Design a protein with these regions (language model features):
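Switch/connector loops and helix/strand junctions flanking conserved nucleotide-binding motifs
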Residues: 55-57, 122-124, 152-156, 185-195, ...
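Nucleotide-state-sensitive switch-loop elements of NTP-binding domains
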Residues: 2-19, 24, 28-132, 138-142
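Canonical P-loop GTPase G-domain recognition
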Residues: 172, 184-265
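Conserved beta-strand segments of the P-loop GTPase G domain that flank and frequently precede/overlap
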Residues: 17-19, 48, 114-117, 144-150, ...
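Inter-motif core of Ras-like GTPase G domains
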Residues: 112, 126-152, 167-173, 177
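Helical mechanochemical/support elements of P-loop NTPase systems and associated helical scaffolds
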Residues: 84, 88-99, 122-129, 139, ...
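A contiguous pocket-lining binding segment that forms or flanks enzyme active sites
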Residues: 160-183, 192
Length: 265
């Protein structure tokens, strides 16, 4: 306590925390986007922070499963999957200094650090783990909130997605970009809906009034003004991580966000 960190962030990597609900395609994005960045000439490393991952499509440069694995903790402490994941994240927090030390060493030698977070969004974004890592790592950081395009079946889904994105942003204290994945399988024009939400909110309200019904629709309608007050208009980025489509746009908005890091307005 009381000692200043000797870690020099001036030449360290930019950190991208890839977050999202289970099945959003986080690990696929980590793999494919890392290769995209390497093709541009960058030095890129990937950290896996999911203790429950059985297989990964990439070879992690840091793997939290070296500290704890879900299957082991379930067997040892007679826990189910949900309790096991919570207990596993507690163990990671208990050994957080080890995690931070390794990530900082990786960051010293590379341009980008992609962090593939827990399969369950809430374990990283809304519990102690995410906040501790972001705060202690002390590196330029941006969050990517990855959303499966199939989750958008009606206009109010856009509102709820942006509400979650805003909550993550202020919980972790970093800029968060909402990225829509699996756009090749979308059933509705997600980009159109999201652009209307940001740039024509009154038209979007009318769309909700005309198509959505029930309490959730009423709540979404009332939330639009509050969300847009704190979440400024932004370009809508849609990708297919598997096919690497939209990666130029993703790279561009990440670059822009890092250039304005710290501006939460």
């Amino acid at each position: 306590m009381g000692e200043e960190s000797s870690f020099n962030t001036a030449s360290a990597a930019q950190v991208v925390y890839i977050m999202g609900f289970a099945g959003a395609g986080k690990s696929t994005l980590a793999k494919e986007f890392s290769e995209f960045l390497r093709d541009l000439g960058y030095r890129v490393v990937i950290a896996n922070l999911d203790p429950g991952a059985e297989t990964l499509p990439y070879k992690p440069d840091y793997d939290v499963r070296s500290i704890v694995r879900l299957a082991d903790i379930m067997r040892r402490e007679s826990l189910g999957p949900n309790g096991g994941l919570i207990r596993a994240t507690e163990i990671i927090v208990e050994r957080i200094s080890e995690v931070i030390d390794y990530l900082q060493r990786l960051a010293r030698l590379n341009d980008w650090l992609l962090v593939d977070t827990t399969g369950q969004l809430e374990l990283f974004a809304f519990r102690e783990l995410g906040e501790r890592i972001v705060t202690m790592l002390e590196l330029p950081s941006v969050g990517v909130y990855l959303v499966d395009a199939s989750m958008f079946s009606k206009p109010s889904d856009v509102v709820m997605t942006q509400l979650i994105s805003l909550a993550i942003q202020y919980r972790l204290g970093i800029n968060v970009i909402t990225i829509v994945n699996k756009i090749d399988s979308e059933r509705i024009p997600v980009r159109v809906l999201m652009e209307e939400f940001f740039f024509k909110p009154e038209d979007f309200k009318q769309r909700i009034s005309g198509s959505d019904l029930g309490v959730l629709a009423d709540l979404a309608y009332d939330l639009i003004d509050s969300i847009t007050r704190y979440l400024p208009p932004t370009r809508v980025i849609t990708i297919s991580a598997l096919k690497r489509t939209g990666f130029d746009d993703l790279y561009s908005i990440l670059h822009e966000t890092f250039c304005t890091c710290g501006d939460m307005t």
